[in-house]
């Protein structure tokens, strides 16, 4: 009898053991693929004649690739992301009943005294006749980087409010310190600045809905996708890749910060250059960094952790 009970116990134990899934080994090749990306980025940066800082942030697992990412660079027009964010935040506050906040629906009547250099859309409006909304001004600011539209929005939301919002998000090195095309302010050292790492943090908070409501987050990203001018990140990317970004250019400076929507693996990226001897080379370098990063995330988005390309799931299944 005892022998029979022992045999039954042994059989049951063996059956249970056989049903347990063996633990998978963790030393996969994904870290090697990441190291290859780091090497390629290092090579691009090393052969660039100016100074390059960059941050790449995986929006799926938070992994980051950093090079000179905590150094402060001029943002040029990339700072317009922060202006746009403040406009959206104030619109939300106004909906909640706050007084004195800018709304997306507020009307602006074009005044020619607001014109500055690189204001192609605003310059074509009829003075004291054409009326547009703050949302329209934001579209001019983002889609074609209209500087007059940007300056009007800075006046309406308040430069100090933009900076207060950035500080509230923990971004202490990202600062709006002057309006667009204010050469006197720039000569005083009042440059608009940020670090690549802080720009990716800002984009991550926007993407994850930590800076705006869900509704406004969707509207914000949709508007940032409408860029039609000088996107350096998109230089080498396939035409069908969605990108929400804002580039910037000054003499000797090229920057671009945005979210690249690689399938199943979106990432935030900010590349900033300064002391550029060859500005076209800087633009190409930003495009090369973005392409190498995209290739990595596009591959990770369609493979298992062991590197097998997985078949696509048919729609509806």
Protein language model regions, located:
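A short, well-structured edge-of-sheet supersecondary motif
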Residues: 36-69
């Amino acid at each position: 009898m005892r022998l029979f009970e022992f045999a039954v116990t042994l059989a049951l134990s063996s059956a249970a053991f056989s049903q347990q899934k063996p633990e998978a080994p963790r030393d996969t090749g994904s870290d090697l693929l990441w190291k290859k990306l780091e090497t390629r980025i290092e090579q691009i940066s090393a052969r660039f004649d100016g100074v390059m800082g960059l941050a790449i942030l995986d929006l799926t697992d938070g992994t980051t690739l950093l090079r000179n990412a905590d150094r402060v660079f001029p943002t040029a027009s990339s700072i317009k992301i922060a202006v746009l964010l403040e406009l959206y935040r104030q619109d939300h506050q106004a909906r909640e009943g706050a007084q004195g906040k800018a709304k997306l629906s507020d009307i602006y009547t074009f005044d020619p005294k607001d014109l500055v250099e690189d204001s192609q859309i605003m310059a074509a409006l009829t003075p004291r006749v054409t009326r547009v909304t703050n949302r329209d001004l934001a579209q001019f600011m983002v889609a074609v980087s209209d500087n007059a539209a940007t300056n009007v929005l800075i006046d309406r939301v308040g430069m100090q409010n933009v900076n207060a919002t950035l500080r509230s998000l923990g971004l202490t090195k990202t600062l709006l310190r002057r309006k667009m095309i204010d050469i006197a302010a720039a000569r005083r050292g009042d440059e608009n600045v940020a670090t690549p790492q802080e720009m990716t943090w800002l984009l991550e908070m926007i993407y994850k809905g930590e800076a705006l409501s869900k509704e406004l987050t969707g509207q914000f990203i949709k508007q940032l996708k409408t860029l039609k001018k000088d996107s350096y990140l998109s230089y080498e990317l396939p035409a069908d890749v969605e990108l929400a970004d804002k580039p910037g250019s000054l003499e000797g400076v090229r920057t671009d910060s945005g979210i690249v929507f690689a399938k199943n693996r979106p990432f935030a990226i900010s590349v900033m250059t300064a002391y550029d001897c060859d500005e076209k080379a800087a633009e190409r370098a930003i495009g090369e960094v973005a392409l190498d990063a995209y290739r990595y995330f596009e591959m990770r988005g369609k493979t298992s952790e062991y590197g097998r390309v997985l078949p696509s799931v048919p729609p509806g299944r």
